[in-house]
């Protein structure tokens, strides 16, 4: 499972997010994207890197990037924790190829699952914006690693950090994959729901290609599962960031995704 699916999909993004933040991508992106992130989410522009990488790379890339931004002093603790509520998202390849094409036999359905996922994440971010304030930001002056180290050395450091994070992610995926197996035996609709609340990879073969399956797929990918929460806790370890906002953010995103899928299922499935 990890060798065929998890590691190829996540490891490059774990390395990339660490490399981009250490090379100063957050500072470079902040001025141009502050006009979007600040009015919508009351977050500085550098937070966009966590949101974009989270949407592209899948769980737990968004959380990893948010933690890196906080460690580098680019976000306050409150900003980083609000960002965690909506920046940690599912991989589009999983939504479009595995669920859409593989389960529903339609890339179009997968694209709609992806769009629902993005919209619910953004709506979750809007819901959490009321808790924060964000004015003009003076970013801390720091030496960018590429000024003192070669790009090769910076890459080696990012790969080492990514490997440590990848081991934790794989450990939780395997643990919850095994834990979810007995739940699948419950059958009916209860079994898939409980499996989906626990671990996403185990849910895939249990999803029926109908309206219920569409709502279940959207809701569970929005929630992420207990496995994703533990993966997130692992990448946040030592950062000082709390998991609470991530938990409530994923719960809200899962609920919003389910409602949107329920509204759209007749039109999407035709």
Where are these regions (language model features)?
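Alpha-helical transmembrane segments
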Residues: 6-10, 109-125
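Transmembrane helical segments that form the transport core of multi-pass membrane transport proteins
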Residues: 23, 155, 159-225
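Alpha-helical transmembrane segments of multipass membrane proteins
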Residues: 120-124, 128, 176, 180, ...
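Alpha-helical membrane segments and immediately flanking helix-loop junctions
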Residues: 40-104, 194-208, 212-239
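Juxtamembrane boundary at the C-terminal end of a transmembrane helix
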Residues: 260-270
């Amino acid at each position: 499972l990890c060798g065929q699916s998890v590691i190829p999909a996540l490891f490059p993004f774990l390395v990339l997010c660490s490399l981009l933040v250490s090379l100063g991508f957050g500072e470079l992106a902040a001025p141009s994207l502050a006009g979007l992130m600040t009015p919508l989410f009351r977050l500085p522009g550098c937070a966009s890197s966590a949101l974009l990488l989270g949407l592209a790379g899948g769980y737990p890339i968004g959380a990893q990037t948010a933690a890196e931004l906080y460690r580098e002093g680019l976000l306050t603790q409150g900003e980083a924790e609000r960002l965690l509520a909506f920046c940690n998202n599912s991989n589009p390849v999983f939504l479009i190829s595995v669920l859409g094409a593989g389960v529903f036999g339609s890339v179009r359905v997968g694209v709609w699952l992806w769009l629902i996922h993005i919209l619910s994440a953004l709506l979750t971010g809007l819901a959490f914006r009321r808790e924060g304030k964000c004015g003009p930001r003076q970013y801390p002056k720091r030496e960018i690693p590429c000024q003192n180290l070669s790009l090769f050395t910076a890459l080696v450091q990012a790969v080492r950090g990514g490997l440590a994070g990848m081991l934790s992610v794989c450990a939780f995926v395997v643990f919850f994959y095994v834990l979810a197996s007995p739940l699948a035996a419950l059958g009916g609709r209860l079994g898939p729901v409980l499996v989906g609340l626990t671990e996403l990879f185990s849910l895939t073969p249990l999803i029926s290609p109908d309206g219920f399956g569409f709502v279940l797929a959207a809701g569970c990918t929005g929630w992420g599962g207990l496995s994703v929460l533990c993966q997130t806790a692992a990448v946040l370890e030592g950062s000082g960031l709390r998991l609470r906002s991530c938990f409530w953010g994923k719960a809200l995103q899962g609920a919003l995704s389910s409602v949107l899928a329920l509204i759209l299922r007749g039109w999407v499935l035709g």
